[in-house]
């Protein structure tokens, strides 16, 4: 039986799936995506939505990257656990990520159910504990637990194969990051056989790697578990009064202490169409500055992350019914990405990412900015070094991103100087 993923035009989706060999069976694996995070460091972009629902790259949302990786690899039983302000995320999953074909294959948004009492999730491990009915229903041999808010390409099947070969209870995906940034991650120390000997969750003084003290081997927040071992660990963690019920802080160290944790080096992962330049690209866009810089990479002449690799496509149907972008009355865009449905009329866009359904009116200038869907930039307005959230209106003649002192009175400014205008704001 053939499976078709509806992503805009069904025929195109079917063509891609056929090319990727989607007749492969993955019946023994269940994927759980943790998508309940608040994303406080991305405020105000997360003021009205969960972090995985934040728009990215003109036509995507952050969750589209992990879902694309799982679907491209043929893992078609996916549960997305949501909690914090999840309405837009739930709606996106229901509209953009629906299968036509066997009902045994699905991407399901699963809000917090309070199955174990009148309490919300107390941590990432507690989220899975409270959702074990999903595991019991499917009875998989392996459970993938992936984060929902990173920008990257990965073939999870290669990690699963590595996990099976290791014979361990859990495999953690690891990547090298600068030691100066590693305090934001779980940090891994492993022996020559990839056995994790120590796992430190967000340490103040991260350890360097043996061959390069300036780098740290960090957890990507992606795990493969043998199912029985995961269930046992969650049950024991539930009854541990000292636990914070966190995957990285409690569950992974539990397996490390038992000698049952394996590390998978993300640098070994190869996806179709990748190059040496973009291989092992992974970005945590959890701060405004990181989010902004990831967008600036996209519009560079030779971006490190190539959105245009159709051998491993990043999928989304964010307003797929919109017409192409239009440039009229001498409107131009230079070194920019302009998404469908947008109109640049007698205005100039430079070094920017302009999302769907944006209007830039006569005489306006947009430079070095990220403009999210539905924004309106009025006549003669100037928007520079900014992030404008959805449906922001910049009135005629308004200037943002030029006078920092004035901007500080109205908007949030990141440590890197990026001005952020929140959703639905009228300037």
Curated annotation (Swiss-Prot):
Pathway involvement of the protein, from the record: Glycan biosynthesis; glycogen biosynthesis
GO molecular function terms noted in the UniProt entry: ATP binding; glucose-1-phosphate adenylyltransferase activity
tRNA processing in keyword set: no
Highest taxon above the source species: Bacteria
Keywords: ATP-binding, Carbohydrate metabolism, Glycogen biosynthesis, Glycogen metabolism, Nucleotide-binding, Nucleotidyltransferase, Transferase
Keyword ATP-binding: yes
Reactions performed catalytically: alpha-D-glucose 1-phosphate + ATP + H(+) = ADP-alpha-D-glucose + diphosphate
Positions bound to alpha-D-glucose 1-phosphate: 121, 186, 201-202, 219
InterPro entries given in the database record: ADP-Glc_PPase, ADP_Glu_pyroP_CS, GlgC_bac, GlmU/GlgC-like_hexapep, NTP_transferase_dom, Nucleotide-diphossugar_trans, Trimer_LpxA-like_sf
CDD domains: ADP_Glucose_PP, LbH_G1P_AT_C
EC number: 2.7.7.27
GO terms, biological process: glycogen biosynthetic process
PANTHER family found in the cross-reference section: GLUCOSE-1-PHOSPHATE ADENYLYLTRANSFERASE (PTHR43523:SF2), GLUCOSE-1-PHOSPHATE ADENYLYLTRANSFERASE-RELATED (PTHR43523)
Protein function: Involved in the biosynthesis of ADP-glucose, a building block required for the elongation reactions to produce glycogen. Catalyzes the reaction between ATP and alpha-D-glucose 1-phosphate (G1P) to produce pyrophosphate and ADP-Glc.
Assembly behavior: Homotetramer.
UniProt family annotation: Belongs to the bacterial/plant glucose-1-phosphate adenylyltransferase family.
Name of the protein: Glucose-1-phosphate adenylyltransferase
Organism: Corynebacterium diphtheriae (strain ATCC 700971 / NCTC 13129 / Biotype gravis)
């Amino acid at each position: 039986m053939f499976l078709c993923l509806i992503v805009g035009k069904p025929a195109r989706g079917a063509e891609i799936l056929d090319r990727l060999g989607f007749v492969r069976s993955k019946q023994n694996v269940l994927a759980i995506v943790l998508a309940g995070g608040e994303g406080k460091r991305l405020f105000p972009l997360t003021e009205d939505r969960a972090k995985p629902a934040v728009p990215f790259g003109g036509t995507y949302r952050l969750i589209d990257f992990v879902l694309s990786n799982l679907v491209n690899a043929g893992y078609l039983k996916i549960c997305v656990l949501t909690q914090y302000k999840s309405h837009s995320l739930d709606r996106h999953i229901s509209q953009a990520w629906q299968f036509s074909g066997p009902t045994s294959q699905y991407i399901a948004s699963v809000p917090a159910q309070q199955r174990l009492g009148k309490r919300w999730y107390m941590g990432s491990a507690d989220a899975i504990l409270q959702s074990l009915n999903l595991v019991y229903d499917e009875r998989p041999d392996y459970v993938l637990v992936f984060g929902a808010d990173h920008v990257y390409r990965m073939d999870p099947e290669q990690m699963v194969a590595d996990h099976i070969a290791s014979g361990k209870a859990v495999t953690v995906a690891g990547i090298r990051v600068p030691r100066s940034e590693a305090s934001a991650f779980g940090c891994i120390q492993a022996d020559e056989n990839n056995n994790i000997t120590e796992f430190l969750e967000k340490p103040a003084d991260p350890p360097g790697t043996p061959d390069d003290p300036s780098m740290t081997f960090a957890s990507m927040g992606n795990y493969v578990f043998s199912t029985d071992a995961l269930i046992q660990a969650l049950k024991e963690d539930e009854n541990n009064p000292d636990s914070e019920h966190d995957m990285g802080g409690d569950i992974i160290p539990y397996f490390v202490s038992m000698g049952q944790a394996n590390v998978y080096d993300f640098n070994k992962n190869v996806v179709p169409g990748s190059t040496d330049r973009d291989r092992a690209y992974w970005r945590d866009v959890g701060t405004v500055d990181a989010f902004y810089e990831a967008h600036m990479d996209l519009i560079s002449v030779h971006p490190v992350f190539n959105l245009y690799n159709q051998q491993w496509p990043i999928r989304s149907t964010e307003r797929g019914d919109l017409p192409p972008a239009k440039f009229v009355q001498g409107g131009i865009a230079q070194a920019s990405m302009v998404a469908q449905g947008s109109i640049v009329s007698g205005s100039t866009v430079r070094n920017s990412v302009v999302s769907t359904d944006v209007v830039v009116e006569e005489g306006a200038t947009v430079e070095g900015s990220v403009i999210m869907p539905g924004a309106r930039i009025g006549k003669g307005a100037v928007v520079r070094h900014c992030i404008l959230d959805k449906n922001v209106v910049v009135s005629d003649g308004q200037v943002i991103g030029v006078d920092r002192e004035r901007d500080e009175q109205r908007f949030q400014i990141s440590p890197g100087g990026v001005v952020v205008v929140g959703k639905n704001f009228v300037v």
